[in-house]
């Protein structure tokens, strides 16, 4: 299993981990060249002689957080996601897609969801646009577990929906780009 460590591992961007069930699989990870002109070359990664500072920082972040820290953080994130999900469920102009655990995708049948995304962005929220169906998603992280965040999101989501309703044909922001890209019948032709 592989995982990037910057969101939930609390490490800097640029690191990932590859987890093996046991040593028998991990041994295939190594690159070994016995014929290299510089001598025997062994590397545990594709990157070869890449500096180890990011790996060391990742290791330090994971050791500092510890198993119990990760368990506690996971619990807080899942609780925050429940609160944010309730906010989305309570907003009549948007609807959740699927039955999400912590990555909350939602769409709208009444307003341009990408305009909602743009307005939320102006209010400091980092959501990503999705297509087919037109939707946006919020990836719940530990930052969303702070007190009052769900209430602030409820306030900002309601204001963003109203702004999208009031300016349905605005040409600024990401809404026009997402709308146009989502309308291509053959996406690979772009």
Question: Where in the sequence are the language-model features?
Answer:
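Active-site C-terminal subdomain of aminotransferase-like
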Residues: 1-102, 106-111, 184-187
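Non-catalytic terminal extensions of PLP-dependent enzymes
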Residues: 71, 90, 100-101, 107-190
């Amino acid at each position: 299993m592989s995982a990037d460590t910057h969101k939930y591992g609390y490490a800097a961007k640029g690191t990932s981990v590859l987890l093996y069930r046991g040593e028998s699989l991990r041994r295939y990870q190594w690159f070994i060249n016995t014929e290299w002109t510089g001598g025997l070359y062994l590397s545990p990664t594709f990157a070869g002689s890449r500096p180890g500072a990011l790996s060391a920082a990742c290791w330090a972040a994971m050791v500092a957080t510890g198993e119990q820290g990760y368990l506690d953080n996971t619990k807080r994130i899942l609780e925050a996601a429940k609160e944010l999900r309730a906010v989305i469920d309570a907003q009549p102009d948007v609807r959740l897609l699927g039955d999400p655990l912590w990555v909350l995708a939602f769409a709208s049948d009444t307003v341009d969801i990408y305009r909602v995304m743009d307005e939320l962005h102006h209010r400091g929220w980092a959501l990503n646009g999705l297509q087919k169906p037109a939707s946006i998603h919020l990836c719940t992280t530990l930052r969303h577990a702070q007190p009052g965040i769900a209430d602030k999101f409820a306030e900002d989501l309601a204001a963003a929906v109203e702004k999208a309703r009031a300016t349905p044909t605005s040409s600024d922001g990401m809404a026009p780009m997402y709308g146009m890209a989502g309308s291509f019948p053959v996406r690979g032709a772009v």
